[in-house]
Design a protein with these regions (language model features):
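N-terminal active-site segment of His-dependent metallophosphoesterases
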Residues: 1-46, 116-124, 220
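Conserved beta-strand segments of alpha/beta enzyme cores
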Residues: 2, 50-52, 72, 85, ...
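Conserved catalytic scaffold of divalent metal-dependent phosphoesterases
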Residues: 5-14, 58-146, 192, 213-216
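Active-site neighborhood of phospho(di)ester-bond hydrolases with catalytic His/Asp-centered motifs
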Residues: 5-7, 28-34, 52-57, 74, ...
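Binuclear metal-dependent phosphoesterase catalytic core
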Residues: 6, 65, 78-82, 154-158, ...
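Active-site environment of divalent metal-dependent phosphoester hydrolases
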Residues: 10-14, 35-41, 57-64, 94-98, ...
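A generic local structural motif
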Residues: 14-20, 37-41, 72-74, 113-117, ...
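A short, gly/pro- and small-residue-rich
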Residues: 47-58, 148-151
Length: 220
């Protein structure tokens, strides 16, 4: 399965020179947020691959202009596509008074808890799709680009194979990796665009998901 991950900055190669040939072979497009509505809608003209997205902290215009047409919002969902189980949690850490798609740690933990039963019913998750990174895992030094500590708990409890995020542009720090590993999880920074391939999901080989409510206490 070939996946194109995009985030934060429209790719010139896609925005100015997109074609069906350029997106040939792409099975799924994942957007980590902070992309113009018209950019996502534009890409739908060149591919039959579904475009799944979560919101970024700069996507407030979606609330006034409407969500991107032809795309699927997976924010606060466990979305299963061809056996691939995707948990979506958009938004950034709250760093100013803007109300749109910014969350405190407590608020994000509550969102995570609300997804627990959906994840259990799906038998777990394979891919975590977010806008922000996890705290201490290739996040930024400034308040606006700090990651969520609760995402570390989620990675430990759910152990997804892939964690795809944006928010922290690679241009911010030359030492930021595009791809790294954290335990059993491959972590991908999707800023602008990144293409990767994964094995086709095998539902038969899935491990049984835990029944216990994961230890995600509501805390600051």
């Amino acid at each position: 399965m070939k996946i194109l991950a995009i985030s934060d900055t429209p790719s010139k190669a896609l925005w100015d020179y997109c074609s069906r040939e350029r997106l040939a072979g792409v099975d799924l497009i994942l957007s980590c947020g902070d992309l113009p509505k018209k950019y996502l809608e534009y890409l739908t003209n060149f591919t039959a691959a579904p475009i799944l997205y979560v919101h970024g902290n700069h996507d407030g215009s979606y609330r006034t202009e409407g969500e991107p047409g032809g795309c699927i919002c997976v924010d606060d969902q466990v979305y299963v596509w061809k056996g691939l189980r995707i948990m979506g949690l958009g938004g950034s850490i709250r760093y100013n008074r803007e109300e749109t798609f910014q969350y405190t740690e407590r608020e994000m933990r509550r969102r995570m808890r609300r997804l627990w039963f959906k994840a259990h019913r799906a038998g777990g998750i394979d891919l975590l799709l977010t806008h922000s990174p996890a705290a201490g895992l290739n996040d930024g030094d400034d308040r606006a680009h700090k990651g969520f500590a609760c995402f570390n708990d989620l990675l430990e409890e759910y152990q997804p194979k892939w964690f795809v995020h944006g928010h922290v542009h690679l241009s911010y720090n030359a030492n930021l990796p595009r791809v790294c590993t954290h335990g059993q999880t491959t972590v991908i920074n999707a800023t602008e665009r990144y293409t990767f391939e994964i094995p086709d999901p095998d539902p038969v080989a899935r491990k049984r998901f835990f029944w216990n409510d994961p230890a995600f206490p509501t805390k600051n």
